[in-house]
Amino acid sequence: GVRKRFLTIMSDRAYRPAQSLCMLFYMALDLCDAGTSWKAEVPKYGDAPFRKELADAVEHAGADCRAAFVERNELFLDLAENYRKEGLYRAFLTSAAEEAEQIAEDYGKIRKEDLDAFAQAFSPYEALMRCYLQSEIFSECLGEPDDVEYVTVKLQWIALEYAAIRHAAFLCWHREGALSYETMRSCMVILSR
């Protein structure tokens, strides 16, 4: 089924977790567009050459890194504000939210070199994030076997969590100059609630 194909794609270490998520969205939207014949489309996603072609298309889609960064920062600020209103996770969120607010004042101060350096600091945790995403997909994408739209909505929520976790890790890294396992764990635990 769909969840099995999602897990196959997410477990493929040939692709970064973020790239795998984009592939999953393409698959989910493709299945939604297929209408009542969507079940006939599922098997092609089990084919390794097809997945490679899909990954190449995702890689060359030309996403605007600056706009994506701004969106992640705004998402994080929204989540942080919601947690603040509830009085939750202040010890962790205060410094990360302050960093996000400072960045929001002038997005131009975040350079491509900063994002590349963060990608290097984050890379040791990609396997951890892949396991997290697999677990989320396994547990959250349980919907009705015939309800592709339900699974697509669940996948959107998982992607939002991933984006928030990764951005919180960026904020901590940017503020502290390093990304420890403990910091990464805090990002995952707090922002996946």
Per-region residue spans from a language model:
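Hydrophobic, aromatic-lined core segments that form the binding pocket/scaffold
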Residues: R3-R193
